[in-house]
Amino acid sequence: VGSEMCIRDRCMAAAKLANADTFIKHLPDGYNTMLTGDGTNLSQGQRQLLAIARAAVADPPVLILDEATSSIDTRTEKLVQDGMDGLMYGRTTFVIAHRLSTVRNSDCIMVLEQGRIIERGTHDELIAQKGRYYRLYTGNFAENS
């Protein structure tokens, strides 16, 4: 029983870190709700939040996140981004993204074109260079911030 309680506490802490706790509590049976194997009874955003929670439970030293905020609305993107920020804290993380909001706070951003690194730096450094990242950022993101 003690071990089960530790696992439950760890899962709940991970869900809170991932911003999944609120929607989980609103599921028919809360944390005891059975999900379909392919997650079709959840929204895309809810599936993303659960993926972040699962990663938090696994506690890996390195994360690889591939398009973590794709296919979700802007409101949910904020929840996912906040959850990812909590998950990434203190870890080496590789983020593959087209939505530049996902990488803006990264220590190092690498811009790839046809499989080659064409620019590298922080957000501010890349903006100052006024290269490809700058054009992508001002064209795709600046109007939304």
Model region roles, listed by residue range:
Residues 3, 11-20, 30-130:
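ABC-family ATPase nucleotide-binding domain "signature/switch" substructure
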Residues 128-145:
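C-terminal boundary and immediately downstream tail of ABC-type ATPase nucleotide-binding domains
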